[in-house]
Amino acid sequence: MLGVVAACAFGINAHAASGTIQAGGVAPNFTLLSQEDKPVGLTDYKGKWVILYCYPKDQTNGCTLEAHGFQRDIAKYDALNAIVLGVSVDKVEDHKTWCSKDTFSFKLLADPDHKMVDAYGVPLVTYKEMKFANRQTFVISPNGKVVRVCTKVDEDIPGTVQRC
């Protein structure tokens, strides 16, 4: 993603269920509901690059800046045959509320049961007894392999896709 994005400030109590998926590994399939309350799975995008980014919380400053950065660069992703999917542990209703205020042409997926974030080994951060997905981005090739894992906001994800 291009641009500087502020990180969400949460308490430092993170854990990952099974260790983060590494570059070179197969991306686990998942099916989650989008902000439109429709199921979306990784296999829906076979043959395309997938930029799967996990973020802590809808409508927070850092997460909004990050989402706007992906939206700003959406034409670059389209030109690279790549789609963007955002995932948080928020509920579909939270995504609907956010999308009623901000316009995103990509899907926001709800993972309130932590199934996808656990499968990918995304650490969960606990803050005031609530859990949030840690910020991570997975660049997945058209054949379903993870080619890059970004554990911080990466300003050159389009460049990563282009180089691969």
What do these predicted ranges mean?
Residues T64-F104, H114-M116:
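Structural microenvironment flanking redox-active thiols in thiol-disulfide oxidoreductases
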Residues M1-G11:
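Bacterial N-terminal signal peptides
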